[in-house]
Amino acid sequence: MTGRATFYYDFNSPYSYLAAERISSLFAEAEIEQPEWQPISFGHLLQTTGRRPWSLPPEGPDPDHLAEIQRRADDRGLPKVVYPEGWPIENYSLNPVRAAVYAKESGRVVSFSLACFRQVFAAGRDMSDVDNVLVAAAACELHPNAVLKGIETKSVKDKLRAATDEALSRGIEGIPTLAVGDELFWGDDKLEEAVAALRRE
């Protein structure tokens, strides 16, 4: 048995947004246990692996990827994808993923993460502005003051670093990735394959 799947993501990734919007329903339809949602630091992942994603200048953002993201959003009835000013570098912050770690401790990681993704890619809000993180927190009934304190705690910072290091140790190089035992399914378009692997168990 592979056990429960783990969904790795960060809020700066539009493909993670697309995956987050449908992963729960895919698992529910397949009648398999919902995955663990695990926020990680994409920035640390890239620094460690040396990978250069499609979204980074000077070559990126790649217009083909942007068009594909919008096509998928349209096909799934999602709002027009809006990128915050300064995306993907200038607005990158650890505060949203730290807040997600805090939300996980409170049992609200899924609702917070969806609220945060929608702030970024449906509303185009800059999540390096902590006030926008707190809007997402309030949307899932997390007290903004508690979140503000939580993201500064050593415990939350250590858990985020440990989760990112674990992702690296599993061979994860990009997000979103769904880990099913030793198998890694990298990309929004790989979710169905991951579900099929779980159903074979």
Question: Residue ranges of each PLM-predicted region?
Answer:
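A structural signal for the main folded, soluble domain(s) of proteins
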Residues: 1, 85-87, 155
